[in-house]
């Protein structure tokens, strides 16, 4: 355990010298009789790129009309150090500032000598035209807009928070995000996996302490996977989940879960070679099995986790924009660890279970859970009616193996048998429903029902970025881009639950609807996702008059979507 503490401490110390945005760039403004000035004071070892410096008055670029100071040369780039003064004489202002209240926009990007590049920065100033003079306001970050206009998406605000706040506040906040995510369905697929692994390792020496230790190993490596995958994904410019959701990869991991299930049934055992077992036994009497727990924790985060939530997307946007992979990776690690806190309590609770013969039934139960997880993984690439058939068959076998035909004498055994009868009845219904083409788990015997949600909304399918860009700029109607994929579970939920709602269908009649299918994760799709700052479906982006107004990452209910898009 001590080594984990050392690793985390070293991880944190890496950021001791990193300046926050406020420390790196201090923007000021002043008004004079014949001019105004904008000053950018730079922190220690910070420099600005001259070709990234832009100044606008009422959306008109006046960068080429400003007398800039002499720049320094750094490699092949012209840069500014220490302080940059931008003087704007009244004669220039009178040419472009025709209104009483005008808007000045300043854009720049800077880096530090340590190799860190900050987000491109945008600052705004109000320019008031008075008789024979101009007055400039103090700088502010967010452009003032009508209350009905929604500019910043949730993940963008999180990315900006990463870029501007204190390092330890960032980690604490992302730990809080993780705790909130633990209250959502994101964590549910992890529970049966961890529980079955712990039960599989049970023996006479099984204890609360050891159970908690196994849970910690699982959560630690799950968190490590999120951090590593996030950093790699940012460098690739696409979601690592998109790569790992290829059909061949999904089939491979489904086979792994099937293998674990048969191991639960006692068909075979996973064991290290004898030489390694002897080495581990010498190091720790309880060491055997920890490697397997760690591997499953790592893989569970990459494959089983169904959510690409706003905190994750926000961290990825920050990493991609700045190259600060360590800070973004740390935030992802802490967020994932917070998300795994309930798993630690589950492991601790399993430690109170006393082993005995009845545990064999528990292992069989979790074996079927593993098979259910394998089917769930394959549901991303197989038609829904075939998935119903598979679950129906699994339910029948589960009822038999768990003792539906055994005699019942006690109240507990009778309750158990009643539950198994209900499971058997439901399993037969979804099996028959699947045979006749049904796709709804809640209404499997309604054979004539065809999901209206898939046909209620009319979409155009465009995957080419240039075509999307042209459509956004030229279309007179508001536009909704729907980033989706065949393997995306939450995308299916959006279609089945949110976009089947009559209120949403009615509201969407005012929009041009475009689906962007990123199932294949090819170069064109990766480019499109990168251009729109999308790190994994589902993502909904709303445009109006060629400008992005709202971005939603992950599943959203019909009620919540209406609140966001209604004026």
UniProtKB/Swiss-Prot annotation:
GO terms for cellular component: plasma membrane. Residues 1-16 form the signal peptide. Residues 188-211, 269-289, 354-361, 407-417 are cytoplasmic. SUPFAM superfamilies: Thiol:disulfide interchange protein DsbD, N-terminal domain (DsbD-alpha), Thioredoxin-like. Disulfide bonds join 111-117, 186-307, 488-491. Its EC number is 1.8.1.8. It holds the Pfam family DsbD_TM. InterPro entries: Cyt_c_assmbl_TM_dom, DsbD_gamma, DsbDN, DsbDN_sf, Thiol_diS_interchange_DbsD, Thioredoxin-like_sf, Thioredoxin_domain. It catalyses: [protein]-dithiol + NAD(+) = [protein]-disulfide + NADH + H(+); [protein]-dithiol + NADP(+) = [protein]-disulfide + NADPH + H(+). It is found in: Cell inner membrane. Residues 430-567 form the Thioredoxin domain. Residues 17-166, 233-247, 311-332, 383-385, 439-567 are periplasmic. Belongs to the thioredoxin family. DsbD subfamily. This is Thiol:disulfide interchange protein DsbD. It comes from Campylobacter jejuni subsp. jejuni serotype O:2 (strain ATCC 700819 / NCTC 11168). The gene is dsbD.
